[in-house]
């Protein structure tokens, strides 16, 4: 495949992630949409690194994956805690200022 194809795929994945984040009111779906956007950014970084013959993009993608893994741990812990106390993962139904 041509590197442009990978960049187009990255842009499409990022757009799907943005649409999913902005239109869905479920916290899990919004969380997965953010992860999809991070993976699209990783694909673009690796593609640029391959085109330029450098490892900088791959190293950047590696650090993005590390941050994404930490985000998954913290984000899912927060979502599970909210679900246990509120019995819903809807963003609209959850008001954290009121106990």
Curated annotation (Swiss-Prot):
Q: Could you tell me the keywords of this UniProt record?
A: Cell membrane, Membrane, NAD, Quinone, Translocase, Transmembrane, Transmembrane helix, Transport
Keyword check for Cell membrane: yes
Question: EC number(s) in its UniProt entry?
Answer: 7.1.1.-
Q: Which residues cross the membrane?
A: 3-23, 28-48, 62-82
Q: Does the keyword Iron apply?
A: no
GO cellular component labels: NADH dehydrogenase complex; plasma membrane
Give the catalysed reaction(s), semicolon-separated: a quinone + NADH + 5 H(+)(in) = a quinol + NAD(+) + 4 H(+)(out)
Q: How does it sit in the membrane?
A: Multi-pass membrane protein
Any GO MF annotation of the entry: quinone binding
State the source organism's domain of life: Bacteria
Location within or outside the cell: Cell membrane
- Enumerate the Gene Ontology biological process terms: ATP synthesis coupled electron transport
Q: Enzyme class, one word?
A: translocase
In the record, the note on similarity to other proteins reads: Belongs to the complex I subunit 4L family.
Role, per record: NDH-1 shuttles electrons from NADH, via FMN and iron-sulfur (Fe-S) centers, to quinones in the respiratory chain. The immediate electron acceptor for the enzyme in this species is believed to be a menaquinone. Couples the redox reaction to proton translocation (for every two electrons transferred, four hydrogen ions are translocated across the cytoplasmic membrane), and thus conserves the redox energy in a proton gradient.
On subunit structure and binding partners, the annotation says: NDH-1 is composed of 14 different subunits. Subunits NuoA, H, J, K, L, M, N constitute the membrane sector of the complex.
Q: What is this protein called?
A: NADH-quinone oxidoreductase subunit K
Record organism: Cutibacterium acnes (strain DSM 16379 / KPA171202)
**Classification lineage:** Bacteria, Bacillati, Actinomycetota, Actinomycetes, Propionibacteriales
């Amino acid at each position: 495949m041509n590197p442009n194809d990978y960049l187009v795929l990255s842009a499409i994945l990022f757009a799907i992630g943005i649409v999913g984040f902005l239109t869905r009111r479920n916290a899990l779906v919004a969380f997965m949409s953010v992860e999809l956007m991070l993976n699209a950014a990783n694909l673009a970084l690796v593609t640029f690194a391959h085109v330029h013959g450098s490892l900088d993009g791959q190293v950047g993608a590696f650090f993005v994956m590390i941050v994404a893994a930490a985000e998954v741990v913290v984000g899912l812990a927060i979502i599970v805690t909210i679900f246990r106390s509120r019995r819903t993962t809807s963003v609209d139904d959850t008001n954290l200022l009121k106990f």
